[in-house]
UniProtKB/Swiss-Prot annotation:
Record-annotated OBG-type G domain positions: 160-336
Gene: obg
Protein name: GTPase Obg
Cofactor(s) demanded: Mg(2+)
Superkingdom of source: Bacteria
Spans annotated as Disordered: 345-378
């Protein structure tokens, strides 16, 4: 499922350091000649495509990126130090436009691809460069050049990792607002969600995944009923589907588990009618609204038995958050494992795969047993 993620940033490269007019002054050498050094180069700003990053959310809060200026030159032929460069890591698939003109500048579509967003200014020249046969004591020097400055628009078509599936009012929007930064409209009536919502779930500073909530499906969606069929095709690109099922029932005359099983079977049938491959995609069962159930464990057991379910199952409350942390961590571990498989396949296809060093393989035949003395130990 692809959504456009955008961020506008400003990049300012560093100014080059100034050259200097200086003359050698030592004892017994009254006319030592020019020895002014050049200024250092200003810091540049680069962008590198990183397959371990999947959104541009960090750039929405860090909009200004300014590199340092180069140092000025000094006497005794000392050049100024170059300023450190700044490298911005962006997701693979990021497109960079000039924010003022709309011109397409870069398309970072391969892991490790590096481009220059703003080049640092060159350092100025010291008076050493202006010495000639007719001018033995030049006093000229040049200032450092200004670094490039740009306003850039970063655009990424985000591929959602997790798709939420379920009937209208199953609690999908409540769940995505609970676990991510998305804030969809939530109300106690069906068809609250009229367009897809995208949320980023952060489990740590360096680990995250993207969840997509689409309008709820109803019976007959594969034939055009409701709104969900308009977005079913997008779920084909997700890695795992979360099938949300409401296990509560406001009607006291209705068995909530039997109704939930019937609703779940209707969703699976719509998937099969729309696309058999989509129905075979990895799917996890999420029983929602446990806060409205007297005995969640018994409800879970009854549902699994009647639904003949053998895959992963979680019981949560999207409203108060019960059980959502376990679901989030399980999803993150699963997606990380799938990403490692994809990275390995890509490295092998590109011919860049490097096997692990056998010295770090504890299962090799000549590995020392735990607690055994190492070489050099007494």
């Amino acid at each position: 499922m692809k959504f456009v993620d955008e961020a506008t940033i400003e990049v300012i490269a560093g100014k080059g350091g100034n050259g200097v007019a200086s003359f050698r002054r030592e004892k017994f050498i009254p006319k030592g000649g020019p020895d002014g050094g050049d200024g250092g180069r200003g810091g540049s700003i680069y962008a590198v495509a990183d397959r371990n990053i999947n959104t541009l959310i960090d750039f929405r809060y860090a909009r200004l990126h300014r590199a340092k200026n180069g140092e000025n030159g000094r006497g005794s032929d000392q050049y100024g130090a170059a300023a450190p460069d700044i490298t911005l890591r962006v997701p693979v698939g990021t497109v960079v436009h000039d924010a003022d003109t709309g011109e397409l500048l870069f398309d970072l579509n391969r892991h490790g691809e590096k481009v220059t967003l703003a080049a640092g200014g060159q350092g100025g020249m010291g008076n050493l460069h202006f010495k000639s046969s007719t001018n033995r004591a030049p006093r000229q020097w040049t200032p450092g050049k200004e670094g490039e400055q740009r306003r850039l628009r970063l655009e990424l078509k985000v591929l959602a990792d997790v798709g939420l599936l379920g009937l209208p009012n199953a609690g999908k929007s409540t769940l995505i607002s609970r676990i991510s930064n998305a804030r969809p409209k939530v109300a106690d009536y069906p068809f609250t969600t009229l367009h897809p919502n995208l949320g980023v779930v952060r489990t740590s500073a360096s680990r995250s995944f993207v969840v997509a909530d689409i309008p709820g499906l109803i019976e007959g969606a594969s034939e055009g009923a409701g709104l969900g069929h308009l977005f079913l095709r997008h779920l084909a690109r997700t890695r795992v589907l979360l099938h949300l099922v409401d296990i509560s029932s406001p009607d006291p005359d209705t068995d909530p588990i039997e109704q939930a099983v019937a609703d779940a079977r209707a969703i699976v049938e719509e998937l099969r009618r729309y696309d058999p491959e989509l129905a075979d995609k990895p799917r996890w069962l999420v029983l929602n609204k446990l806060d409205m159930v007297a005995d969640p464990d018994a409800a879970r057991q009854r549902f699994v038995e009647q639904f003949s379910w053998q895959g992963p199952v979680f019981v949560i409350s999207g409203l108060n958050g019960d059980g959502t942390q376990e679901l989030i961590w399980a999803l993150q571990d699963y997606l990380d494992a799938e990403q490692r498989k994809a990275n390995l396949a890509q490295d092998q296809a590109d011919g860049t795969y490097v096997a692990e060093d056998p010295r770090f393989d504890a299962t090799r035949s000549d590995a020392a047993p735990p607690g055994a003395p190492r070489g050099g130990d007494e």
